[in-house]
Amino acid sequence: MNKVVYNALKLSEYRPLFHNLRVLVIGAGAVGTHLMEKFAKMGLSPDAMDFDFFTLENAAKHGCLVRTPEDAGRNKAECASNRVQPLLDDGCTSNGIDSDLCKLGPEAFSDYGYVVAAVDNFDAKVLLNVLIRQLPEERRPIVIMDGTHDEMAQSVILDNTEFCLRCLIDEGWMKDSSIRTSCTGPQVRQMDGAGEIVRTSNLASSMAAHLSAEQLRASVIGHDGVMNRRLTYTAYPHLELSVAHPMRKRNCPGCAIHPPAKIEWLHGSVMDITLRGAMEQIADILGTTDFEMSVHRLNYRKVVYAGFIVEDVCHSCGAPIQVMQHEGRVFPDDLRCETCAAANAPLRPASDFDHREPLRAFTWGGEEAIQQMMLYDLGYPLGAHIEVIQRNGALDFLDAGKITRTIFAFDGDHLKIHEIHKL
């Protein structure tokens, strides 16, 4: 398919400012599809990430990139990225990633100038805030969060110097943080004592995308008074466009997150380096093999997953099974033996069984099968900050004076995000 050839004399003089700018749109649904089209036509290189699929029931809210009915059943991010290809300027790219935020680490965002959170639950927004704030300021992208509520549209742009994403979330909303939301709060209202999902339109979704695109445009150009502002569009009968300056929330747990003081760099990516290969690089830097690589720690939906499950028991019959997965990526169906899985045997409560303690760290002389696994398959997300511990003779972690901790990251992860299509 031939690309569109734009007449430069009919375009804005500042358009060249956008050509080397990469943007990640997290959530390729109602707002996200509108954003992808706008960003492509602005001359950006927009990537999209979403784990969900397009359905016919939501077709009326998506941007015109999505074709009905042929795109039903396709991954949202891959589909949106595919549809914008003819709109991209020469030299610009777009990649669609079938994934969720749990499989990304901080460094996965470091190659982007802007990250737009067009997601509809607070858990994802809180996790994104954690990941972004773990990046040093010189590699930290500007964040835009947008959404809709009824026919109102809103967008907030922030650089994490005055407040963070968590500051924009009322802690009362976190009681059910997985509920469908927008940036204004839960999209559920009480009607006659019953909860009712608030409905929004394509107009509201496209307006939210337009506000975000305008904030990005003005930020790139360098207009004053753009950064750390909230734009709100209110529809008739109270038509209004307002600007507000959000404030830092007192004792905000998100603002308390800071990047490591120092990061040591390894070559490659978690996608193609084995545990043995990583340990060899770490040993060269530390000058010793006497260290431990902590299993990746994932804190999501108020649960901490920090173990690697080597073996467990079938949660149907109790027979021993090999798992070899990070506990944050284990689903109930993964904990059945082949016989019970084939018979679709019902799962019993985990409390019915005795379990082996998962690994909390990997060591130089560990099991060979684990040593040969790729880091990503061991649970380290793309862009991970990997903690390495040297005990230096300490008997336990109470003897903190002897223990040293070093953070490592891979120098290829920030580029790999533009190549992969599924995590």
Regions found by a protein language model. Name each.
Residues 27-29, 51:
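Glycine-rich Rossmann-fold phosphate-binding loop(s) that bind the pyrophosphate
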Residues 41-45:
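Conserved S-adenosyl-L-methionine
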Residues 72-126:
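A structured beta-alpha segment of the ubiquitous adenosine-cofactor-binding alpha/beta core
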Residues 49-89:
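Glycine-rich phosphate-binding loop and adjoining beta1-alpha1-beta2 segment
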Residues 35-36, 80:
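Hydrophobic residues within alpha-helices
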Residues 15-23, 31, 35, 104-423:
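Glycine-rich phosphate/adenylate-binding loop
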Residues 1-18:
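Extreme N-terminal leader/targeting segments of oxidoreductases
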Residues 36, 40, 64:
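Gly/Ala-rich phosphate-binding loop of Rossmann-like dinucleotide-binding domains
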